Amino acid sequence: STLMRSSAASDVYKRQVYRLIESGNEVVVFDNLETGHIEAVHPKTKFYKGDLRNRSEIDSVFDKEKGIDAVIHFAANSLVGESMTNPLKYYDNNLNGTKVLLQSMVAHGIDKIVFSSTAATYGEPERTPILETDPTNPTNCYGETKKSMERMFYWVEKAHGLRYVSLRYFNACGAHISGKIGEAHNPETHLIPIILQAAQGTRDHISIFGTDYPTSDGTCIRDYIHVTDLAQAHILAVEYLMKGGKSDIFNLGNGVGFSVREVIEKAKEVTQKDIKVVEESRRGGDPAVLIASSDKAKTVLGWKPEYDDLGTIIKTAWKWHSTHPNGYSK
């Protein structure tokens, strides 16, 4: 199959490109490299640098790359805090970018898309673990735009026959077991990389944002899922659509929650380093608990996560950070 990916140079998604190529697929990459790294792009991909909001740029790729079977859509701004202070940026990039992509797909007869969604669509859940049928009431603008993108796919299917799979994944983390591919954001915003930067000394401390949540230790609880398992889920979703599967939404998580304090303690155990912790006030838009039920993905897609142990996940990330203290920078 020939697949196009929006934003394949960004950190947590490049493992999926490697897996697609290892499985014999041709992959076309479209990315503006705003937050990604050209060094992370697989050498066997066809890479185009461009802005998804520019219709002529995405049209040009579809014109040149005939025979694209499906699109895997990752391109989006994804920082919860920033989305609360700069919501218009998120509506412009996430919603407008997706609209332009869909317009071009419809014009070029490409009718299958796998979408990178998020647990943030649920907001403060009524229960855990969260089911795909549970209410979606986002508590931040990032989650709101992702929910709106899902609705866009729904209506475009009604009008134009587009089939889609939306993968609502929980906290992506970890690194490739080789230690060659890992997370490198600028600025860094993900919990585990920040903790490990504090452990290796490239960061002074780790901040805990909120210690008064209604949880066992007062800190937020999240479901952590390894990027390799996320990568496999996207491949299975493409195969599902290629075989005629109907549009659907799937949660991707391990079904177990860990508090911020628990993650820090596990990182201390893995790294054998002391990690300075600073307690701060809550950030806007952070739900107290997010834990997934992924039974549907396991049943329908045949998804089987390999990494269900937090210590193992952190070990893979620590291997990356230990050998790449400056990320992809030389």
Q: What spans do the regions from the language model cover?
A:
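Single conserved hydrophobic/aromatic residue that forms the stacking wall/gate
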Residues: 1-9, 13
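Rossmann-fold cofactor-recognition segment
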Residues: 44-54
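Aromatic pocket-lining residues of Rossmann-like dinucleotide-binding sites
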Residues: 20
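Conserved glycine-rich Rossmann-like NAD(P)H-binding loop of the short-chain dehydrogenase/reductase
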Residues: 25-34
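Catalytic helix-loop patch of NAD(P)-dependent Rossmann-fold dehydrogenases
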Residues: 85-103, 107, 111-112, 121-171, ...
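Conserved mid-core alpha-helix of short-chain dehydrogenase/reductase
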Residues: 57, 100-104, 229-232
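C-terminal substrate-binding subdomain of Rossmann-fold SDR/epimerase-dehydratase oxidoreductases
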Residues: 11, 15, 194-330
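NAD(P)H-binding glycine-rich loop region in Rossmannoid oxidoreductase-like domains
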Residues: 52-93
